[in-house]
Amino acid sequence: RDVAPSRGLGDVYKRQPQARLTVMDLVKGACAERIYPVGRLDRNTTGVLLLTNDGDLASKLTHPKYLKKKIYHVYLDKNLTKADMDQIAAGIQLEDGEIHADAISYSDEVKRDQVGIEIHSGKNRIVRRIFESLGYKVVKLDRVFFAGLTKKGLRRGEWRYLTEQEVNFLRMGSFE
């Protein structure tokens, strides 16, 4: 069984902040099988996340050799300079190795504190670490695309079952 929730902190966490609800609470009762997240989003990141009970599919979507695309909308504490954007595109040296953005662009050419970044890496907190290494604070981070899946039509905290066609495309590796 494959489920795609639109992960959000918002109302779910505000209702009972001491409970520290997780994405698994959002999909409780979605299916009889045990499902688990494919990849990860840290507690302060919102966006599309896939849950499945198919270990082979999870491996295909998370192993670096399969190069599955992730696109994030990044909100920064200040405008990103063109020089820093070029440096991110060329590659940034982090403590666990060099990371390259596959693509990066301003979300708005006038207000340059929001960018879209495409990466294939699944390293922990990689997008936040890229910007922090250059002196930026990530104010908000939203994953808008993962392996061909988007959160289109889903509000924060909502989820849906994948269509049979989506599952087949994922299994065949047809999505980036």
Question: What are the language-model segments listed below?
Answer:
Residues 9, 45-47, 68-72:
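Short glycine-/polar-rich loops that comprise or flank the Walker A/P-loop
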Residues 6, 50, 74:
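Residue-level signal for inorganic ion chemistry
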Residues 29-63:
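Glycine/acidic-rich beta-strand-loop module
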Residues 17-33:
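Substrate-gripping "pore-loop 1 plus following alpha2 helix"
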Residues 56-115:
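Non-catalytic RNA-recognition surface used by pseudouridine synthases
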Residues 90-93, 97-176:
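RNA substrate-recognition surfaces in RNA-acting enzymes
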Residues 11, 20, 32, 44, ...:
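Short, charged/polar surface micro-motifs in flexible loops or helix N-caps
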Residues 2-13:
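Single conserved hydrophobic/aromatic residue that forms the stacking wall/gate
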